[in-house]
Amino acid sequence: MGVILEGKPVAEKLEKEIKEKIEIYKTKGIIPNLCIVKVGENEEAEAYAKSIERFFSRIGINVERKNFAENVSLLEFQKALKELEKNNKVHGILILRPLSEELERQKAFRFLSPDKDVEGITYENLGKLFVGEKCFHPCTPQAVIELLDFYKISVEGKDVVVVGRSISVGKPLSILLLNRNATVTICHSKTKNLEELTRRAEVLVAAVGRPHFIGKDMVKEGQVVIDIGTNVVEGKLVGDVNFEEVKDKVGYITPVPGGIGIITTRVLAMNLLKAVEKNEARN
């Protein structure tokens, strides 16, 4: 059986570092503050928001909410983001997806201040990531990097295949890996020789959003498999990788749940603390 790359010890290490920084801010009278912005009603988005609230409350980070009706206008949404940008007591802003169809079509997240963009989704932060400048990294891709670092898995000079090309995970993760001198191949729904490419990889990352998409015929002996998928099947959380089918074949594999997801919320907290630093530097 391959080595299980548990997310818990990585999360615990990061959480310890986060708490230490929060205590330092407390001595200065600063309480890190995140504003969660939500449009309409969505059960998954609400569950995600509550999980963040529980974790942040436990470690000493304040969370406030800004809720909008489904039919909120682009102008009203833009105005609210501008007010949050000017509010020095709000250090970071998290916009829950999905937005309304109109706001998604208008790409409303572009009105988010890059300095408070703790998810690294604005064009400015993504552009800086592309050229290798200091910026907020998208949380899930950075969580993968934190896991690789913790387990001392180097990607330098290795063939890495990322299955998935989303703007929030697949593309930014590919850049982060490329910046570490990996040879990266991005695969997607139109890739013709997908199985051949995934079997060739030394490190395989599944971020396609389809339950159990990666099976035993798509992996090879000794491979490192990182599963980013979060799919609900019959009430259970499962990954993009068929864990039971491939675990005895590969060398290393992350579980779902218990893998990348638990690290992602810690990265969000780390980004928020960086936003606090930016805010203090401006003031």
Curated annotation (Swiss-Prot):
Its EC number is 1.5.1.5, 3.5.4.9. One of its GO terms (biological process) is tetrahydrofolate interconversion. It catalyses: (6R)-5,10-methylene-5,6,7,8-tetrahydrofolate + NADP(+) = (6R)-5,10-methenyltetrahydrofolate + NADPH; (6R)-5,10-methenyltetrahydrofolate + H2O = (6R)-10-formyltetrahydrofolate + H(+). Pathway: One-carbon metabolism; tetrahydrofolate interconversion. GO terms for cellular component: cytosol. Pfam families: THF_DHG_CYH, THF_DHG_CYH_C. Belongs to the tetrahydrofolate dehydrogenase/cyclohydrolase family. Catalyzes the oxidation of 5,10-methylenetetrahydrofolate to 5,10-methenyltetrahydrofolate and then the hydrolysis of 5,10-methenyltetrahydrofolate to 10-formyltetrahydrofolate. This is Bifunctional protein FolD. It comes from Dictyoglomus thermophilum (strain ATCC 35947 / DSM 3960 / H-6-12).
